[in-house]
């Protein structure tokens, strides 16, 4: 409920009225008064650790941290007094004295919050000796931590605890040796980390980042430089909603088709749309759901989606008893890799081992997924050879000095380039469930359901990132849910275990908002106060769906051809071998 009680305050001698209970920081920024900060995350991390947000309050002798103190009636606040500016400078200088300032070679050099605050404060001289900690960290794990860049803001600790409920990070050491490390003295690879990457996208510096695989693709000995290799790039749905942000381009200009042209300029031989494999996933998953519904007593309910590896990892470590309830369908990434290394290789007369398949994903967990058992369908190694996050592919493009703004649009390649609107909404929370039910409805009734206000899929209630839905298919009502963030997943599972609710079909995405806000997406400071606010990226994908000539996965002609020529039918023996897992 919105607080309608107002208090009268002054900020920099300007009288204002703001809602009672408002934090000083919010009151200042909402009214156009800039107050810097490094640790603050609204409703998640409000601990005043960085001391950069200090302000002066008349009548209080000491400076006040604005992120965790509320306005009071009659309060007079100064945001930029000489005393405030000097305190901020000293605090940031002390942070820099324990920070590895290799800014020119840092992956966050263009969007480092610490660097920006230091620049805004006009810090041009190092007044304190620079000594930063160094800690051993495995270079092969998909998540990399550089202790020398950690400013102890505690964002990673809080986002993992409160949003994802995995408690991977904790404070270790005491006094000047205090730092952040993996909980329980574990190595990161031994922990329950789901690799959702939310700690990375909320880190103000490069203390946390994905393992960089760009050099393996674009280096002097990289895959693109090897003339004996046929290089294939496959692009996830959510990438098109965000890649242009790294180049200052609008979603209307930075389209999926312009990304195809860009990747061809980089040197990829083929560029395919993962939306195609999303349509393939829908064909398998919707038929699997219907098959289970025909034998309801044979299975435990609900059936969960399985295309998010962060969610699958969470289920394996936290609720292994639920694994039989996960769909056996592989993710679109892994389905595509299997199809490329078998069907596509045969069709083009290319030995599978001579194909390098690079998956471009909004996700860090995909870097681990490609190494899991059963992801080598062709018998010649991994189906997917490399995963590059959206951030990595943008760094690769920049390294090649490609002017994206001058490139034309270009279609995805055949025979695996056709996709539908149902495939593209995979990248947004609720999209997998909606796409699957569109096709399940057609399979049962022989008719396509209406889309939009007249859709048989009705939203019963929505609370934050949790949505409860119901669909009537020929008199059979399916009770469904779609949710994002692992904390929401835990709350739903616990509620089901207590017998408070029942569902037939549940979609879970590890990242708030779905893949559009994945751990591999471009980092935007505006997100760091609103971790669930990714409406613009969601609307981008919904727009692609609305404009699509085909909006049902079962109408994808390229998918139909794949079944006719190779897979035979959904859930066939060959489809099971290539497109499903035996166990988790």
Where are these regions (language model features)?
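Residue-level recognition of alpha-helix initiation/capping sites
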Residues: 19, 141, 151, 194, ...
């Amino acid at each position: 409920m919105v607080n309608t009680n107002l208090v009268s305050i002054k900020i920099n001698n300007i009288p204002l009225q703001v809602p009672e209970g408002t934090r000083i920081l919010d009151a200042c920024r909402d009214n156009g008064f800039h107050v810097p900060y490094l640790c603050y995350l609204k409703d998640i991390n409000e601990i005043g650790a960085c001391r950069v947000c200090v302000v002066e309050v008349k009548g209080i002798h000491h400076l006040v941290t604005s992120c965790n103190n509320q306005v009071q009636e009659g309060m007079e606040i100064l945001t930029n007094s000489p005393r405030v500016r000097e305190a901020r400078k000293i605090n940031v200088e002390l942070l820099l004295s324990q920070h590895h300032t290799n800014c020119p070679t840092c992956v966050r050099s263009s969007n480092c919050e610490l660097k920006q605050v230091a620049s805004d404060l006009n810090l041009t001289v190092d007044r304190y000796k620079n000594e930063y900690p160094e800690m051993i960290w495995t270079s092969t794990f998909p998540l990399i931590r550089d202790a020398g860049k950690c400013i102890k803001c505690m964002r990673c600790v809080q986002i993992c605890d409160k949003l994802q409920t995995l408690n991977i990070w904790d404070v270790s050491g005491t006094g000047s040796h205090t730092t952040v490390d993996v909980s329980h003295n574990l190595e990161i690879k031994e922990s329950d980390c789901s690799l959702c990457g939310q700690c990375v996208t909320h880190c103000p510096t490069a203390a946390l980042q994905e393992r960089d695989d760009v050099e393996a693709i674009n280096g002097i000995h990289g895959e693109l430089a090897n003339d004996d290799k046929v290089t294939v790039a496959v692009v996830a749905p959510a990438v098109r909603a965000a890649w242009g942000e790294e180049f200052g381009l609008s979603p209307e200009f930075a389209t999926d088709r312009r990304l195809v042209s860009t990747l061809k300029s980089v040197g990829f031989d083929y560029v395919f749309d993962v939306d195609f494999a999303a349509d393939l996933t829908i064909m398998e998953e919707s038929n699997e759901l219907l098959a289970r519904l025909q034998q309801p007593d044979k299975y435990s309910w609900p059936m969960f989606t399985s295309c998010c590896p962060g969610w699958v990892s969470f289920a394996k470590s936290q609720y292994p008893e639920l694994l039989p309830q996960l769909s056996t369908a592989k993710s679109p990434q892994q389905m595509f890799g299997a199809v490329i290394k078998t069907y596509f290789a045969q069709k083009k007369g290319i030995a599978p081992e001579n194909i390098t398949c690079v998956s471009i994903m909004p996700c860090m967990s995909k870097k681990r997924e490609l190494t899991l058992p059963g992801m080598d369908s062709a018998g010649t190694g991994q189906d997917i050879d490399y995963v590059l996050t959206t951030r990595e592919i943008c760094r690769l493009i920049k390294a090649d000095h490609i002017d994206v703004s001058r490139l034309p649009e270009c279609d995805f390649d055949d025979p695996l380039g056709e996709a539908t609107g149902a495939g593209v909404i995979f990248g947004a929370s609720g999209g997998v469930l909606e796409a699957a039910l569109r096709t399940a409805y057609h399979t049962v009734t022989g008719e396509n359901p209406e889309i939009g206000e007249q859709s048989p899929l009705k939203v019963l209630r929505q609370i934050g990132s949790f949505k409860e839905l119901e669909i009537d298919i020929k008199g059979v009502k399916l009770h469904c849910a779609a949710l994002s963030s692992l904390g929401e997943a835990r709350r739903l599972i616990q509620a089901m275990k207590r017998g408070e609710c029942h569902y037939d079909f549940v979609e879970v995405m590890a990242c708030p908002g779905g893949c559009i806000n994945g751990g591999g997406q471009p980092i935007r400071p505006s997100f760091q106060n609103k971790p669930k606010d990714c409406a613009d990226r969601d609307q981008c994908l919904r727009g692609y769906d609305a404009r699509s000539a085909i909006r049902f996965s079962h109408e994808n002609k390229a998918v139909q051809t794949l079944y006719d020529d190779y897979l035979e039918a959904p859930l066939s023996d060959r489809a099971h071998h290539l497109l499903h897992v035996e166990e988790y």
